[in-house]
Amino acid sequence: MTADANGAPREMLVNLQGFMGVGDRKVSFPWKLFRFTPGGRHEPVILDMPATAQLQPADRPKAVPLTGSTQAGAEPGQMRIIDADVERPNGAKVGRVVDVLIGRDAQPQAVVLDVGGLVDPDRRTIAANWSALRFAPKDKSLRALLDLNDAQLKASPPYAGDKPILAVSPAAGGAPAAAPATARAGAKR
């Protein structure tokens, strides 16, 4: 998924798999072409796409390079969300985005973060409300900033895709707050 500076979804990146890894490619489609069916992991996400010739040039699917960069193929003013590093406003790294949870209204509700270092014994996965995430310009691209402090991150419950989702939210005064997200587990995109 890519988002703009306001956090609005713009494109969804789809991995088209080839045969035994040969022919794999990633293609980005405009967000407005997708329909989300409420119901969770086993419900389909539908790509409602007319013939390419009927689409405006800006709405046509685009091939995306298969590189390790989270910004590869992102349009100017947009940021690829999955695998993006998330920082605090002071530049300290918080973690890495591993998933985005989409609500019934087809809007991002929460971001799933892998927090802690690779060898950190406190490494875990948490969900943070989408409202805690901001996007700020940096070096001609966008960076993801999280408005949560250490206490909020440590107090946040672990994320489990098969359990009710408790997403940590920014709270006045810096007190930890976990609020149920309206997204369903498994609404991975």
Region annotations inferred by a language model:
Residues 1-189:
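Peripheral interaction segments used for macromolecular assembly
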